[in-house]
Amino acid sequence: LLDRPPELVIEPATLGRTRWRMTTERGDKSAADDYIEPMNKTSPRALPASIDLTVALLAEAEYLADRSLGTVLYLALKMGRPIFLEGEAGVGKTEIAKVLSSTLGRRLIRLQCYEGLDIGAAVYEWNYAAQMISIRAAEAEGEHDRARLEHDVFSERFLIKRPLLQALEPDTAGAPVLLIDEIDRTDEAFEAYLLEVLADFQITIPEMGTVKAAHPPIVVITSNRTREVHDALKRRCLYHWVGYPTAERELAIVRAKVPGVSKKLTEQVVAFVQALRKQDLFKSPGVAETLDWAAALSELDVVALDPATVSDTLGVLLKYQDDIARLEGSKVKDLLDEAKSELRAAE
């Protein structure tokens, strides 16, 4: 008997396939029965070699980042550290992981967090129904060796891999991008487990051994700050607060993402949203809402903002009735006048 579970070392094999190999304490290796086809056979793109190239990389996918975000992303990629992005919903945190995946040519593996998330949903679980069918079939054929049956059913073909385990698998396109989205929705127990995974990028499966990534994934963790995430997890990462963009940057974002909107309307949309964020709202509109509003106004063939149009379309910008109620009466007109006044002053 082994004093500890054997270790599964994931190694690339020949012919573009991937082999799982089991290493015991004695150093013996036995090839596992199953193989896993890499999901992406394209050559990986080199990581950006500077902060400016990191910002340019994001810009390729029309993600207009400021230099501070470019700096922390560059350092995270260079140092192989997870990046922890915190900020209000709708400011573009999740999009960063998607952009990194597309521009670098890597797989995107997303773990959407929620209350009650456990190892079975985040890491792995066994296909119990398939295991029972296999046991019944083996017994029907006269197989009664308990040890052999246990070895067979706790093999990789019955293992259902969830995002965290998938992220440790090798890929010919390079290490994947692992997005752990809205970590603040989980509990402290899951945070503690995640901290252990991020420490060594390995996962122990008691029935099989320890799976360790040959090349750690690019990890992006996001939080909407609905609660404070434990300091221990944040210390493992490089941290960046993603705030609302300046008017100039938001204007550039809208022009890039919704190019069909006229220059005049785009400027009015951004100026109004910027003014709206200064109000005492339960949930201020994010960049996502700005883009949705610009697209909606374009669909309505609006050429310039007026109080009636703004009031009719507030549901695109604001998602809480209390916030919409705060803008009743002359408030919309006052904000619109303020926005237009700022535009005239900037001319």
Task: Indicate residue ranges for each PLM-predicted region.
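Hydrophobic, low-acid, alpha-helix-prone terminal segments
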Residues: L1-P5, V9
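C-terminal regulatory/interaction module of P-loop NTP-utilizing enzymes
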Residues: Y35-E347
